[in-house]
Amino acid sequence: MVVANDLSSKILPRVLIVSRRTLRKNKYVDFVGEYHLDLIVSSGAVPVIVPRVNGIHSMLQSFEPIHGVLLCEGEDVDPSLYADDELSDLSPEDMEEIKKAHAEDMTIDREKDSIELTLARLCLERNIPFLGICRGSQILNVAAGGTLYQDIDKELGTTMTTTNHIDYDNYDGHRHEARIVEETPLHKLFEEMEIMVNSYHHQGVKRLAQRFVPMAYAPDGLIEGFYDPNRYDPKEGQFLMGLQFHPERMRLPGSDEFDYPGCALVYQEFVKAVIAFQKKQVNATQVEMKRKTTTLVKSFSQAEFLEANTVLSKQQENRLKQMGATVRNSCVYMKRMKMKEEQERAMDKLSAERLSDMLSFHHMMARLCSNAIKRKLLEPEHTDRTIESSFFLNY
């Protein structure tokens, strides 16, 4: 856990969390569970809430920089986003029963789907750390090309072993068994092969996206956790994990103490990856800025020797003076060019007769100057400067 005093002098990494919408006093209200926020803050990151507002999916670039994304609970994911290539065995009668049993959860929120799928795909493309809890894990699977059961009881309930994945009368107290796969991150975090997990969902992973590997199963065979083995190294800023259960709610009755230390460790490892990712991004930005600065300095009168906080030699000081002279000369040159252009415009306005008179005058002045120079060259004091004077004659 990060001490608050240590955070005041740092710019902390940002973790985006999409809010959920509910109806209160005849008005929609957005909210995010404080359990998630507390765990993110105590682990050393800043939660940035993305409001579930119409049109926000097209404004997500304005939330940059994004160092991590946490997606959590919410309504069912729209089946049209993943079920196009698989025929459902659910009949119209089945769908009616499901709606009656899970009326609130089956209210599709397409704006939230759009926001969260966009963020999940962004994380997949840019290797941004991602943690998906409950619905968030389903979004991650769909974003990567996987599919979902529209209703576990109807589609998976025919197996020999059944599991109660939801208890509307006992949200926090409900538990069911989950068997952890050995040598997976979840096994290392919980140090157990079997744990009792809290969950409330009627959908779940049907076909796991190819890039993911299961970390835990319910007794009925439903995947309770998965990760990308090629994208999991928190110290290096890599974290891509989905958990169907709720580690943030797995607490002892009447206490804030977790059922297992691994519940908080999930968030701590996630934020560890977020911090490492931010550091990499900052370093990459600094390298790019240094590269651009070096290019600029090199292009400025070939001043490769310029480095910050370096004592300059006499030669380097002279080169700096030359650079200054170059800048001054270039300014004079530009002024002369401007004057020349103005003079040319003025000459264009003169008549041919006037221009002819001016040309004759300049030829006469040239002859007079030439004769004067020849006379001076014949004088004794100028005999040792013949070579220099010949230059002017030729000119």
From Swiss-Prot:
Mutant lacking the gene: phenotype: Enhanced shoot branching phenotype.
First-tier enzyme category under EC: transferase
GO molecular function: hydrolase activity, acting on carbon-nitrogen (but not peptide) bonds, in linear amides; transferase activity
EC assignment: 2.4.2.-
Residues spanning the signal sequence: none
GO biological process, one term: regulation of secondary shoot formation
List of catalytic residues: C134, H246, E248
Glutamine amidotransferase type-1 domain sequence ranges: 45-280
Induction: Induced by phosphate starvation. Highly repressed following nitrogen deprivation.
Keyword list, A-Z: Glutamine amidotransferase, Stress response, Transferase
Family annotation (Pfam families): Peptidase_C26 (PF07722)
Keyword Transferase: yes
Gene3D superfamilies associated with the record: 3.40.50.880
Keyword Transferase among UniProt keywords: yes
CDD domains: GATase1_2
Cited InterPro entries: Class_I_gatase-like, Peptidase_C26, PuuD-like
Role description: Putative glutamine amidotransferase that represses shoot branching. May act as a factor that links nitrogen stress response and branching control. May activate strigolactones by amidation, or represent a new pathway for repression of shoot branching.
Record's protein name: Putative glutamine amidotransferase GAT1_2.1
Species of origin: Arabidopsis thaliana (Mouse-ear cress)
